[in-house]
Amino acid sequence: MSKRSKACDISPKVKKKVWERDNHCCIICGSPYAMPNAHYIARSQGGLGIEQNIVTLCMRCHNDYDNGNSRVSTGYKIQWYLKSCYENWNEKDLIYKKEMINK
């Protein structure tokens, strides 16, 4: 596994923290049938598997965010939510950079 892939993976520890932070439900629709595995900044764009970049979404909302017409509006909702959870939240801190991994 590459360093980037490892950095973008979501660890069980992060999933647990996000699940608790998100009150065990989808942050968009409130469904309890959800999982803490949605990247705000996509893995394909270098989005890290850190709690500041991960949210709990149900399958429908996750699919709409990844593939649907509501990507922009859902993205704004996720962004607002994460900003409300983390005082110094910044999108730039959510993206993999080679220099962040110990050499």
Could you say what each language-model-derived stretch is?
Residues 2-6, 44-55, 63-103:
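Polybasic, low-complexity binding patches
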Residues 9-36, 58-60:
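Short cysteine-rich loop/turn motifs with clustered Cys
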Residues 25-27, 41, 76:
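Short, well-ordered helical secondary-structure segments
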Residues 34-44:
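Short recognition patches in nucleic-acid-associated and regulatory proteins
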